[in-house]
Design a protein with these regions (language model features):
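Generic detector of well-ordered alpha-helical segments enriched in charged/polar residues
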Residues: 23, 53-54, 92, 128-132
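GT-A fold catalytic core of metal-dependent nucleotide-sugar glycosyltransferases
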Residues: 62-114, 118
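A structural motif
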Residues: 118-132
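Active-site-proximal specificity loops/subdomain of glycosyltransferases
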Residues: 33-71
Length: 132
């Protein structure tokens, strides 16, 4: 079963962190644990892809968050959402009854593309392990 934990990652300039968006996840999901990952976690964690994270940090912070998300999901389980996304209603408990789930990107603009900003799994999920 997927744990009721929302993981939200923001690396870079904390003054630009979309706290208004993050708060929508907190407000609509009061019975979930919300874990905000940030700049301090880059050095505090023993990342498997630390070398890639460091190299990516020189070019694109979105890529750093992408690399972090897979390791967080694999190690902790839960649901990772993009920090700049808004939650408009609470998440349904039936989603948690599965080993993993993901959402499609915009089907009109990007058909059959899985949205990396909305992925969930149990800790140790082998598919997520293969991504890492």
């Amino acid at each position: 079963m997927i744990p009721k934990t929302l993981h939200i990652i923001w690396v870079g300039d904390d003054r630009k962190r979309p706290d208004n968006c993050i708060q929508t996840w907190v407000d609509h999901n009061p019975d979930w644990t919300v874990q905000l990952w940030g700049n301090d976690d880059l050095s505090a964690m023993g990342w498997y892809n630390a070398r890639h994270i460091q190299a990516m940090g020189q070019r694109e912070l979105n890529g750093v968050a992408d690399l972090m998300r897979w390791e967080i999901l694999y190690n902790e389980g839960g649901f990772v959402v993009d920090a700049d996304s808004e939650c408009v209603r609470g998440l349904d408990d039936w989603l948690l009854e599965h080993e993993a789930f993901a959402c499609w990107e915009n089907e009109l603009d990007r058909p059959r593309l899985i949205a990396a900003g909305y992925v969930a799994c149990e800790a140790g999920n082998p598919f997520i392990g293969q991504i890492i």
